[in-house]
From Swiss-Prot:
Its main location: cytoplasm. Its EC number is 2.7.7.23, 2.3.1.157. In the N-terminal section; belongs to the N-acetylglucosamine-1-phosphate uridyltransferase family. In the C-terminal section; belongs to the transferase hexapeptide repeat family. Its cofactor is Mg(2+). Coiled coil: none annotated. Residues 227-247 are annotated as: Linker. It is found in: Cytoplasm. It catalyses: alpha-D-glucosamine 1-phosphate + acetyl-CoA = N-acetyl-alpha-D-glucosamine 1-phosphate + CoA + H(+); N-acetyl-alpha-D-glucosamine 1-phosphate + UTP + H(+) = UDP-N-acetyl-alpha-D-glucosamine + diphosphate. Binds 1 Mg(2+) ion per subunit. The gene is glmU. It comes from Francisella tularensis subsp. novicida (strain U112). This is Bifunctional protein GlmU. Residues 248-455 are annotated as: N-acetyltransferase.
Length: 455
């Protein structure tokens, strides 16, 4: 049994006061329409048609690479008119119709609507809400059958009291759409062609109307302005947080936790406030993430501690390692078991060996550091000569004294020691002491200048 999908995405979204279409506003780091497309793609439809209008090129660019047919609605004359533009591109099968600005609709709810709607039925997704203001109302007869959908601007006082609303999501066979869409008239306050009129046509043709409901009310919430967008962001994030907590993770405050990608978690983790997850992140068991941390496209193994105000991007933090506070681990780092990237340490494309420590105020770039090394405060690997990047290699058990500069390319041998304040531009053999700084002198005849006093 095949399925076509129509996503309506032609609206301007004037209340967003933006230079991009409403459906390209972002929620959890994805555009609204990407959320919708991701949900319908899981239904494995034969084709997806997106009806565009305002700034159509931007919408097409955002969905580039997906198996989507774009149809341009030159004049925004209503939802019925929009679906009519898509009609020639649909196959002779059931059609699922939904909106590009309703981002939280789940695949499960859509699948239920499609599966329970026969080819000769009209499927309608409705919901009961406490505040139906601004939404189309579902009107039923005395037997409970749906008779029509009335938009709020066209509703009378009695109809405005109805709390069952139209979500705008339908499932109907193309054959019925071919019959009904040309019959829609713009005889309403807005002078638009409402898709909701197909309810009236279905009743007239004695077509059975199949009504289903969403699992959660938030799934059918649309976005018209930035206030609604922010509210929906919190709904999304709270829902994600609850799913994560159900897997055995403690979150200090679910209202101050953001996932902008995918998070795979182990058990007994602790996540403090204002943590942001970007891209694909995996946490092992017993991981502790301090406040104000950002984790992006990284793997954090068991028993790791990421202390507050730290960032880990595109790297692996091995079991029992410690990062932070105020540390930045940039892409392509591998922090081995029990190693320490301490406060105000930045690492980029660096391997920090098992048990090694860089505890304070250090830059490690393009480096390979062995096991059980000590990198003192203020150490800098000088990896860039103005044109190319070069590598620093430090052997196991090496000791790099504070405030030293290692001019790459350079090798520090196993067990070697670099004296504090040294600038090392040549390789240091194993177990040697390297020191390069001016000899200390004491000048016993020196006198401190006397401050001039005001006259």
């Amino acid at each position: 049994m095949g399925l076509s999908v129509v996503i309506l995405a032609a609206g301007k979204g004037s209340r967003m006061n933006s230079n991009k279409p409403k459906v390209l506003q972002t929620l959890a780091a994805k555009t609204l329409i990407e959320h919708v497309v991701s949900s319908v793609e899981k239904l494995n439809p034969d084709n997806i048609v997106v009806v565009t209008g305002h700034l159509k090129e931007q919408v097409e660019d955002a969905l580039q690479g997906r198996n989507i047919t774009f149809v341009y609605q030159q004049q925004q004359l209503g939802t019925g008119h929009a679906v009519l533009q898509a009609l020639p591109y649909l196959k002779e099968q059931k059609v699922l119709i939904l909106y590009g600005d309703v981002p939280l609709i789940s695949t499960e709810v859509l699948e239920n609507l499609v599966d329970t709607t026969n080819d000769d039925d009209l499927g309608v997704l409705t919901a009961f809400v406490e505040n139906p203001q601004g939404l189309g109302r579902i009107v039923r007869d005395k037997f409970g059958a749906v008779t029509e959908i009335v938009e709020e601007k066209d509703a009378n006082d009695i109809q405005r009291q109805i709390k069952e609303i139209n979500t705008g999501i339908y499932c109907v066979h193309k054959n019925l759409l071919q019959k009904w869409l040309p019959e829609i008239k713009a005889n309403n306050v807005q002078k638009e062609y409402y898709l909701t009129d197909i309810i009236t046509f279905a009743k007239a043709d004695h077509v059975s109307i199949n009504v289903t409901h969403p699992i959660n009310e938030f799934e059918i919430l649309g976005v018209n302005d930035r206030t609604q967008l922010a509210s929906l962001e919190r709904v999304w994030q709270r829902n994600v947080a609850e799913k994560i907590m159900a897997k055995g993770v403690s979150i200090a405050d679910p209202n101050r936790f953001d996932v902008r990608g995918n998070l795979d978690v182990g058990k007994d983790c602790w996540i403090d406030i204002n943590v942001i997850i970007k891209g694909n992140v995996k946490l092992g068991n017993n991981v502790v993430i301090g406040a104000n941390c950002i984790l992006k496209n990284c793997i954090i193994e068991d028993n790791v501690r990421i202390k507050s105000n730290s960032m880990v991007d595109g790297s692996i933090i091995r079991e029992g390692a410690i990062v932070g506070p105020f540390a930045r681990v940039r892409p392509e780092c591998d922090v081995k078991e029990g190693a320490v990237i301490g406060n105000f340490v930045e690492a980029k494309k660096t391997i920090l060996g098992k048990g090694s420590k860089a505890s304070h105020l250090t830059y490690l770039g393009d480096s390979e550091i062995g096991a059980n090394c000590n990198i003192g405060a203020g150490v800098i690997t000088c990896n860039y000569d103005g044109v190319n990047k070069h590598k620093t290699v430090i052997g196991d058990y090496a000791f790099i004294g504070s405030d030293s500069q290692l001019i790459a390319p350079v090798n520090i041998g196993q067990g070697a020691t670099v004296g504090a304040g040294s600038t090392i531009a040549k390789d240091v053999p194993a177990d040697n002491l390297a020191i390069s700084r001016a000899r200390q002198r004491h000048i016993d005849t020196w006198q401190r200048p006397v401050k001039k006093t005001d006259k």
